Amino acid sequence: NFLGTLVNLAKKIL
């Protein structure tokens, strides 16, 4: 899931 990966990356950055 691309969207899930994007959210996961955002959570790691934030």
UniProtKB/Swiss-Prot annotation:
GO annotation, biological process: defense response to bacterium; innate immune response
Keywords from the named record: Amidation, Amphibian defense peptide, Antibiotic, Antimicrobial, Immunity, Innate immunity, Membrane, Secreted, Target cell membrane, Target membrane
A cellular-component GO term for this protein: membrane
Domain of life: Eukaryota
Disulfide bond positions: none
Distribution of this protein across tissues and organs: Expressed by the skin glands.
Family: Belongs to the frog skin active peptide (FSAP) family. Temporin subfamily.
Function: Antimicrobial peptide. Has activity against the Gram-positive bacterium S.aureus (MIC=16 uM) and the Gram-negative bacterium E.coli (MIC=64 uM). Has a moderate hemolytic activity (LC(50)=50 uM).
Name of the protein in question: Temporin-1CSd
Protein species of origin: Rana cascadae
